[in-house]
Amino acid sequence: MASKDVKFAGDARARLLSGIDTLADAVKVTLGPKGRNVVIDKSFGAPRITKDGVTVAKEIELSDKFENLGAQLLREVASKTNDLAGDGTTTATVLAQSIVREGLKAVAAGFNPQDVKRGIDHATTAVIEELRTRTRPIATREETAQVATISANGEVEIGRIISEAVQKVGKDGVITVEEAKGFETELDVVEGLQFDRGYISPYFVTNSEKLIADLENPYILIHEKKLSSLQPLLPLLENVVKSGRPLLSIAEDVEGEALATLVVNKLRGGLKIAAVKAPGFGDRRKAILEDIAILTGGEVISEDLGIKLESVTLSQLGQARRIVIDKDNTTIVDGEGDADAIKGRVGQIRAQIEETTSDYDREKLQERLAKLAGGVAIIRVGGSTEIEVKERKDRVDDALNATRAAVEEGIVPGGGTALARAAEVVARLQFHNDDQRIGGDIVRKALQAPLRQIAENAGEDGAVVAGKVLENGAYNFGFDAQIGEFKDLVAAGIIDPTKVVRTALQDAASVGSLLITTEVLVTEKAEPKPAAPPAGADLGY
């Protein structure tokens, strides 16, 4: 077992604070509309330029193991906030640094760490309640764009694109962010249910210019097994030909004789047909096929359910207004499923999202929910260089997460104002003893830290700006750091999602109050490495 290095009391806390300050000072320069960029050296490829707090935090590893403990614990604050709210990581870091710094001063002055922690927890709960009371729901498309613009560092174009995407796919829709191949940032909205399987054979193409199979008012056969022989399908195919409508076959695979026969019939013009492989694998494939069946009003043809291909009728097939298939994707537009059945399926998927503990499963369930209830939008981020594209993509991700949070929980005035004004609530709180009162004072001071930092990053005196904001009694009155003016922030479109502000404070207080109660640090001792043999030494060969 490796030997350990141990630090106690004041020495331990000083090293911890040094690591926290190093990471926080690197992260907090990015806060606000006039925050600066951080350039990160990568072991491979070009350096990364970013204004995203959590990206900076994740890259910092300190050589001193005791200081690195502090940096790692503060990094946890940023990561947790990012996981829960998707934005607000720099605000959380600034709050945590202030709480830890003031808290360690209180402990050094002889106050009881556990009571100080209780005071911090009590004050944090009161502030979160105040934020919820002051929240108002996001009401207009313009407000959605404003939230996104603020989070994207004031880039109006990003705000407009995200607002448009949210408008088109709804709150249950999925919005993904990708890197574009050109200079422009653009929005691509997928109409209908799309899955990532294209036509099995290019002979199914109906439009040779666009290389797509375009089926109008088709029937849809949804089969979970492979189709190797057409014999069981013949009665159904005859009925489809009589109806004069096209047919899409979705199956695990179509191969051999079955594929050859379908292609020959398609080329002769007797049967308008296309075939695609079923999306997904295993249980997920079964679930997606069931989704498609419910959306199109059909049934999944499965021997497990006692349904055989020979006995399938037209009434068991799905139907849609249109289906478009290219070499990579299939899109079903306006499925003719029963609205109540679709609503029931959506409720079922929502319940599964609530229950699952796996991030991967949650992401896949949300994709399925979007395809049934909302839609899918893709934001393609462009730029002149790869470095610029990556930096913009970071900001688009933050803006998108902030917008989702605003739709979910509402908004409060931005620019650090909502937190600074919540300090009044802490001042009115009752505490059991003086040590807990000190914990409340620590939170009260920390609540001004984001507003001060935003002002300082804009070249102003943070204390003076905070004083002017709090002198004015109007709740929405604050500092617009972009142009250096005091105004009604909500009217000016400077707003923050309540969820982001709340999560930042909760995570900062949680980790910050635990750090205050730290008395001992234990790390592994660095083992001295054996010296390399001198060049040209006799190695005994």
Curated annotation (Swiss-Prot):
Pfam families: Cpn60_TCP1 (PF00118). Keywords: ATP-binding, Chaperone, Cytoplasm, Isomerase, Nucleotide-binding. ATP binds at residues 30-33, 51, 87-91, 415, 496. The keyword Cytoplasm applies. GO terms for biological process: protein refolding. InterPro entries: Chaperonin_Cpn60_CS, Cpn60/GroEL, Cpn60/GroEL/TCP-1, GroEL-like_apical_dom_sf, GROEL-like_equatorial_sf, TCP-1-like_intermed_sf. GO terms for molecular function: ATP binding; ATP-dependent protein folding chaperone; isomerase activity; unfolded protein binding. It catalyses: ATP + H2O + a folded polypeptide = ADP + phosphate + an unfolded polypeptide. One of its GO terms (cellular component) is cytoplasm. Its EC number is 5.6.1.7. It comes from the Bacteria. It is found in: Cytoplasm. Together with its co-chaperonin GroES, plays an essential role in assisting protein folding. The GroEL-GroES system forms a nano-cage that allows encapsulation of the non-native substrate proteins and provides a physical environment optimized to promote and accelerate protein folding. Belongs to the chaperonin (HSP60) family. Forms a cylinder of 14 subunits composed of two heptameric rings stacked back-to-back. Interacts with the co-chaperonin GroES. PANTHER family: 60 KDA HEAT SHOCK PROTEIN, MITOCHONDRIAL. This is Chaperonin GroEL 2. It comes from Gluconacetobacter diazotrophicus (strain ATCC 49037 / DSM 5601 / CCUG 37298 / CIP 103539 / LMG 7603 / PAl5). The lineage of its organism: Bacteria, Pseudomonadati, Pseudomonadota, Alphaproteobacteria, Acetobacterales. The gene is groEL2.
